Amino acid sequence: MKKIHRTLSLFTVAAMCTALLCSCGEVPDSSQTDSSSKAATTTTADTTADTTTTGEESSTASVASAPDSSVSDSSSAVTDDTKTNGITPAMWKVTSPEGNTMVMLGSFHALKDECYPLPEAITNAYNNADILAVECDITSTKEDGEYMKNLMKQMLYNDNTKLSQHISEEAYSALQTYLGYWGMDISALEVYRPWAVSSTLDTLLIQDADFDSEKGLDNYLLTTAHADGKEIYEVESVDFQMNLLINFSDDIYDLMFRSYEGETKESQKQSLEDLYTAWKSGDIETFLEEDNEEELAGYTEEDKKIAEDYNNQMLYDRNKNMAKAAEDLMSQGKNVFYVVGAAHYAGEGGIIDLLEKDGYTAERVQY
């Protein structure tokens, strides 16, 4: 089975709302902690200032952040000025039983400068498509003041309870130890709901490891599509993803926080780098490698049920809807470039597996 992994949740829902959290300015105030904590919070604030603007400035800044890919006009902003940089993420040409086709790409929701300009195979797929299909379009939400205000409210407990009352002592202790590697004290997070704590830690990890959600593949393509006037199709929605994240049970977050036991900042960064390396080479199976008995040591039967529930909600239930959306688009003969998180394509119950079971053929695109 697959236990709960922080890096897995990072690149499905949580990473997609990193920009939302940053634009809220709601990384916890660590003024009560040591200087390292202050430095971590300052880093987040600085990054927010660099990447969060308003109106037209927001779109231009996002594209310009990717080297050699700034938008100069409304024509095709994903240029042919590509380079051989060893980036070959998994991409497929999918054909329906009726003969309609679609190009599907596995994305990574936060990337580094080295990934840009994009490989020619990706730029061609984008430029040749009439529609860009993505998990959700967060570009307008980041500029919606009312939405952001409501999001901030949902990050905090409003019933006079605190974090320590919603998770076990074991989870609290593991989280406290892990926060120490960031120079933070758990007392700074007591007023935050588990989803906000989890997403804040993801944000800090992304930034400390020199990744940038503004340079994430789907965010880059979204920004470009808006500049080009290309039609955007949301497979899910911002509300759907936020509600999923917010409504996970305390039991799921308790197990998630307990998984920090024995982890350090460096070990989490290495896990992130390992997934990034796998993504760059098109190795999607690494995203869903099964855990061995040693790695599952300490998991009770109840823990395994909780992990299964999490993985079903986070991946497999969504995969079914994503595959259906792809089938619907192909049945209409739409010319679509379909881009969702790489983990959604992997293994049994992944998008490719589901499509093949429905009679579709999937051929890996060679770079």
Name what the model sees in each region.
Residues T52-V94:
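N-terminal low-complexity, Pro/Thr/Ser-rich intrinsically disordered segments
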Residues C22-T33, S37-A49:
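Bacterial lipoprotein signal-peptidase II cleavage site
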Residues K2-I4, P89-A90, L118-E120, A323-K324:
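A generic local structural motif
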Residues K3-P28:
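Sec-dependent N-terminal signal peptides of Gram-positive bacterial secreted proteins and lipoproteins
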Residues S31-Q32, K38, V63-P67, V71-S76, ...:
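Phosphate-group recognition and catalysis centered on beta-loop-alpha active-site segments
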